[in-house]
């Protein structure tokens, strides 16, 4: 899909998304590819891309009065004719062009995953000292902000301190490092608190998530990429939640766990794992939006 399409051309192909440059806008297409441990898996997960796109749309709509976002439309009829094909319906998003900021904004409301491993070792998560005596999967007294660098495909993101995020941003935007670092930190915490409270009311714990921000044509900080999807977040069922153990999830943690248990898989998943992953994504979508998932 790298041919010219009217006034559109393939700009970027990531682990999961393809981004097309269409004059003054972008079209982001979420494929059914799935990645874990910074590798693209050999299987595709049916309808996954459309679920991610529709879930991002839900959250962009829900938070648009709090922080502006890049979404223009998810209706392919608003996009160039090339995208008026069945394969693009439901999984494509017309977006404003942003100058993306080179920091991934991670917020953690519960201690789990790599954060739990770090805490057990030295009582910190990404250099942030936490209270003693926390249990695995326990809710933190306050959400913590743990930014990281953006790695190229095949490389690993690197956790950085807030101070380091200022340096990274200052290098690209002289005189603006502190301002942008503060704005994206504050926006990340605000968005997380609002959305985590909503999700909890629907039976889902958002343990942690990742946001990406950019600057619009007016230099305003705007949220881009995806928002609060099972790819960018840890979603746990509220029912049965108990600190002190790992939690079942509605996200790709299920895939990560299978890969860890099967190190010789060569990143090829069996059909039942694929089916279970689709079920989990659809269940999360229904709980959060109140609607059965439909691509069209």
Swiss-Prot record:
Enzyme Commission numbers on file: 6.3.2.6
A Pfam family this chain is assigned to: SAICAR_synt
Classification via SUPFAM superfamilies: SAICAR synthase-like (SSF56104)
InterPro entries with a match to the protein in the record: SAICAR_synt/ADE2_N (IPR028923), SAICAR_synth (IPR001636), SAICAR_synthetase_CS (IPR018236)
CDD domains (UniProt xref): SAICAR_synt_Sc
GO biological process: 'de novo' IMP biosynthetic process
Keyword Isomerase among record annotations: no
Entry keyword Nucleotide-binding: yes
Gene3D superfamilies for the chain: ATP-grasp fold, B domain, Phosphorylase Kinase, domain 1
Keywords: ATP-binding, Ligase, Nucleotide-binding, Purine biosynthesis
Catalytic EC class: ligase
CC annotations in GO: cytoplasm
Catalytic reaction annotation: 5-amino-1-(5-phospho-D-ribosyl)imidazole-4-carboxylate + L-aspartate + ATP = (2S)-2-[5-amino-1-(5-phospho-beta-D-ribosyl)imidazole-4-carboxamido]succinate + ADP + phosphate + 2 H(+)
PROSITE patterns, per the entry: SAICAR_SYNTHETASE_1, SAICAR_SYNTHETASE_2
GO molecular function annotations of the record: ATP binding; phosphoribosylaminoimidazolesuccinocarboxamide synthase activity
Pathway terms, separated by semicolons: Purine metabolism; IMP biosynthesis via de novo pathway; 5-amino-1-(5-phospho-D-ribosyl)imidazole-4-carboxamide from 5-amino-1-(5-phospho-D-ribosyl)imidazole-4-carboxylate: step 1/2
NCBIfam families assigned: PRK13961.1, purC
PANTHER family: PHOSPHORIBOSYLAMINOIMIDAZOLE-SUCCINOCARBOXAMIDE SYNTHASE (PTHR43700:SF1)
HAMAP family referenced in this protein's UniProt entry, alphabetically: SAICAR_synth
Record-stated family: Belongs to the SAICAR synthetase family.
Record protein name field: Phosphoribosylaminoimidazole-succinocarboxamide synthase
Organism of provenance: Lachnospira eligens (strain ATCC 27750 / DSM 3376 / VPI C15-48 / C15-B4)
Gene (UniProt): purC
């Amino acid at each position: 899909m790298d041919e010219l399409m009217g006034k559109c051309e393939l700009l970027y192909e990531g682990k999961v998304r393809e981004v097309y440059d269409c004059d003054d806008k972008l079209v982001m297409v979420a494929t059914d590819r799935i990645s874990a441990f910074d590798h693209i898996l050999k299987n595709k997960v049916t309808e996954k891309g459309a679920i991610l796109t529709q879930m991002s749309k839900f959250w962009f709509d829900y938070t648009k009065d709090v922080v502006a976002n890049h979404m223009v439309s998810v209706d392919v009829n608003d996009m160039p004719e090339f995208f008026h094909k069945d394969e693009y319906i439901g999984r494509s998003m017309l977006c404003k062009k942003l100058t993306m900021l080179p920091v991934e904004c991670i917020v953690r409301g519960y201690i789990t995953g790599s954060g739990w491993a770090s805490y057990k070792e030295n009582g910190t998560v990404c250099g942030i000292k936490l209270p003693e005596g926390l249990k695995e999967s326990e809710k933190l007294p306050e959400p913590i902000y743990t930014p990281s660098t953006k790695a190229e495909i095949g490389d690993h993101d690197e956790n950085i301190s807030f101070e380091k995020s200022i340096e990274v941003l200052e290098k690209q935007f002289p005189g603006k490092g502190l301002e942008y670092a503060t704005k994206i930190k504050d926006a990340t915490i605000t968005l997380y608190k609002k959305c985590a409270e909503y999700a909890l009311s629907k039976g889902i714990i958002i343990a942690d998530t990742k946001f990406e921000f950019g600057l619009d044509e007016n230099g305003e900080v705007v949220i881009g990429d995806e928002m609060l999807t099972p790819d960018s977040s840890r979603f746990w069922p509220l029912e049965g939640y108990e600190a002190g153990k790992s939690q079942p999830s509605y996200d790709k943690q299920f895939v990560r766990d299978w890969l860890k248990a099967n190190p010789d898989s060569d990143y090829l998943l069996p059909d039942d794992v694929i089916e279970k992953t689709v079920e989990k994504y659809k269940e999360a979508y229904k709980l959060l939006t109140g609607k059965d998932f439909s691509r069209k």
